[in-house]
């Protein structure tokens, strides 16, 4: 993306001046502060989050990538780092990572288990090889599947009419 880079092994965060300039359009200091807080919520999550085991790496496995970026945006969503429901992308799939997955993970927290985000992060050490479906079953029970929960979420937020 054009606004930051991932946290590297030394936990540095690079914040693009181009993104700062865009966020400060119309000299709106409040918007700039809000966006900077959101970026920090996302990027600092990378410094502390756990990584899926047994499935490759960020650059080699889309599941790994979707988990990493989805969790970082879930922390941002959960802490008011986006402009509420209006910032939620419509449709898509949890494998899209970032906000699409982030809003879904927070919905799981709000509707299935208040400790979901913490448990989901921890699942990367307990479900090996890690998968979305394996983590869901580990946290919520064998009767749940990631795809069924995604469908339930899409209906609940009005993206799918039944």
Language-model features, listed with the residues they occupy:
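Short, small-residue-biased leader/transition segments that mark boundaries at the very start
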Residues: 2-9
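Active-site recognition of the HExxH zinc-binding catalytic motif
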Residues: 38-51, 69-73
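Pan-zinc metallopeptidase signature
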Residues: 101-162
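Glycine-rich, acidic and aromatic/proline-enriched surface loops and short helix-turn segments
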Residues: 50, 73-81, 110, 114
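Surface-exposed cleft-lining segments at the edges of enzyme active sites
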Residues: 50, 54-59, 91, 120
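Post-HExxH zinc-binding segment in Zn-dependent metallohydrolases
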Residues: 59-102
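Short pre-active-site segment immediately N-terminal to the catalytic Zn-binding motif
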Residues: 19-40, 55-64
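Solvent-exposed loop/turn segments at secondary-structure junctions
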Residues: 19-22, 47, 54-55, 79-82, ...
């Amino acid at each position: 993306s054009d606004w930051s880079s991932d946290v590297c092994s030394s936990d540095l965060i690079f914040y693009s001046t181009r993104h700062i300039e865009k966020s400060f359009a119309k000299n709106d200091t409040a918007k700039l502060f809000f966006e900077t807080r959101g970026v920090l919520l996302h990027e600092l999550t990378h410094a502390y989050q756990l990584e899926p085991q047994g499935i490759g790496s960020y650059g080699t496995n889309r599941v790994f990538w979707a988990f990493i970026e989805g969790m970082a945006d879930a922390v941002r969503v959960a802490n008011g780092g986006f402009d509420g429901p209006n910032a939620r992308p419509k449709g898509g799939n949890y494998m899209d990572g970032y906000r699409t997955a982030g809003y879904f993970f927070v919905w799981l927290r709000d509707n299935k288990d208040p400790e979901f985000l913490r448990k989901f992060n921890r699942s990367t050490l307990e479900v090996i090889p890690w998968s979305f479906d394996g983590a869901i079953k580990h946290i919520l029970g064998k009767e749940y599947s990631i795809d069924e929960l995604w469908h339930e979420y899409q209906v609940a937020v009005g993206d799918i009419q039944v």
